[in-house]
Amino acid sequence: VTYISKSNNIDQQNITQPGTTESQTKLLIYSIQTIGWTTSAKIDPFKGFHLHALFTYQKPKYNNYKVSYVKDGQTFNLDASGNIVKEIPQILVELDPSYNITENLRIWLSFRYFGKTYANLTDALYFNGHWETFAGINWNVNKHLSLNASVVNFLNQKGASGTINGSELTSKKDAAKFNNHLMSGNYLRPFTLELGASIKF
């Protein structure tokens, strides 16, 4: 079990008044605290096969993260202290099996699981957990030439990550207002085939 605390983080946050596009930029100095553990294993059950597995659980929280927004005599307060840090999953899983068909020919798979991540400071909006998958083959043709082929997102998973602009003061009861609205952000890489070669002299 590991405990980590980091103080004097500096953040320049754009705070948007709910229901409007008006925002103010605020400078915050805050702390982050987390506790968690990581378990890693390497398994070679038979010749040529190797499995690496890793599991991480963490719970990063804001501390002393407070800001006020004043507009037309109204004060909007945001206190994210005790909330889970946005964009950071609490659960991470890695599974990496591989098999050497011959001394020079290797096939491999890679699975990455990212748990639920919050998309705003109040933990009112979040993205569901998702898998990211990869696969490939590596062939050392000779001492001068190596070939490889890989597939990104071979399960064709779809999903988003990051934050949602303008949602800093959004409460959990108002989160439904973001349903069925187009928004910009980050997304999982689509199904992709990649080929490569390496030449050594």
Predicted segments with their positions:
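Solvent-exposed loop segments that connect transmembrane elements
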Residues: 11-26, 63-82, 161-184
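Conserved C-terminal beta-signal and adjacent last beta-strands/turns
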Residues: 50, 82-201
